Swiss-Prot record:
Reactions mediated catalytically: streptomycin 6-phosphate + H2O = streptomycin + phosphate
InterPro entries (alphabetical): Alkaline_phosphatase (IPR001952), Alkaline_phosphatase_AS (IPR018299), Alkaline_phosphatase_core_sf (IPR017850)
Signal peptide: 1-32
Protein name as annotated: Streptomycin-6-phosphate phosphatase
Keyword vocabulary terms for this entry: Antibiotic biosynthesis, Hydrolase, Magnesium, Metal-binding, Phosphoprotein, Secreted, Signal, Streptomycin biosynthesis, Zinc
SMART domains to which the protein is assigned, alphabetical: alkPPc
Domain of life: Bacteria
Organism field: Streptomyces griseus
Known EC number: 3.1.3.39
Pathway in which this enzyme or protein is active: Antibiotic biosynthesis; streptomycin biosynthesis
Disordered as annotated region, ranges: 268-290
Keyword NADP recorded: no
Family designation: Belongs to the alkaline phosphatase family.
Role according to the record: Specifically cleaves both streptomycin-6-phosphate and, more slowly, streptomycin-3''-phosphate during the biosynthesis of streptomycin.
Amino acid sequence: MRFAYGRLPWRRGAVLGSALLVLVTAPAASTATERSGPAPARSVILLIGDGMGDAEITAARNYSVGAAGRLAMDTLDASGRRTTYAVDERGRPVYVTDSAAGATAWATGRRTVNGRVSKSHDTDRPMPTLLELARDRGYATGSVTTASVADATPAALTAHVTDRSCKGPADMAACPADTRAGGGEGSIAEQTVAARPDVLLGGGADHFAQTVTDGPFRGRTVTQQARAAGYQVVRDRTQLAAARPGRPVLGLFAPEYVPVEWTGPPAAPGGTAPQRCATRNPGRPAGTPDLAESTRAALDLLTARAHHRGAPGRGFFLQVEGASIDDRAHEADPCGQLGETLAFDRAVAAALDHAERHPRTLVIVTADHGHATQILPHDARPAGLSATLVTDEGGVMQLGYGTALPGETQEHTGVPVPVAARGPLADRVRGVQDNTSLFGTVTAALGLR
Ligand code: MG
Ligand code: ZN
């Protein structure tokens, strides 16, 4: 039943190694969940703002609903902070994480080295992920992002590679051990399709258009591999709306990143004149679904798939990522960053609305790391880049970006990030949490161990 629509079990064992194979192929009837009653949660929605630290949230709140207002993500009752650090190959702390190690921490419950995707810090071995564990216990699974579906944050759920750059079959230079010739399972895109989540929505069509170079799909594109595995491949809002839950769905809405919502002048040395953001990006094709739309579509598809699958009491695990908060902060583009943070917040609202109508849904909102943004006095003269914005409530807000020299990419920061939750086991996010602890919260909520 768990493999009802043609999974490829021969791949799974090879991907994950023998130890995990024992774990994930244990018959459902023998799980702790079934011995001890239903899991606390039927479904988990994990929403990740990439690079969305407190400064990024506060800037978006100030600009839109005002300093005294509340975003959707501000309304969750239980909240705390998560550490964000990575480790080196010897396990020593590295105080600033990248998104690959950051996502690996909650996806696997283990910290790893920067750049690595759900493989161990020392031996570079695959580590089982939340999505794999949920899938193999009969939950529907999904991942939604505004980056490439093969980018680091979604990849941490569906793939195991030495380096996050190994997105498609043509991108394997940094991952010799993951090539099929090297005994591995191929690129992130190939592994993601083989992992067979029920719903995959985002950008990255370019990575899926690459030709597989080895293995059973040699000579075909990863998109063709997906179709062969039963995926409906959709490219825009209309096709997404027409997708049916009978088969899994792969949505590829852009060649790489899904185009951002807002635009405006970048931060500059010496600052900018007070300005407003342009809330319509002319570079965004009309048929491109926004993150909240994709989230609602994923929730509907996963709800239907969980229902059809008929595993009693088991709903789904869904991760939703607002990816370009980070991307725009790297570019010191305050309007792009604010628009993406607010688009992410609308996805949070969609998740909360779903949870309202579907009891026993745990909603968790957090980030992978802090970013460069600083909210400065309006008359400050920072050494780095800055921009001054006029907020919706008429305030003047100066945002500074000073973690790199002008012309260079802004850096992540090592601060703890907010985590907030509503639903079963939400209280577990209170206080200061280790960045790996979300793995335990989700596995406990869904009864995965
Ligand atoms: Mg990301
Ligand atoms: Zn980043």
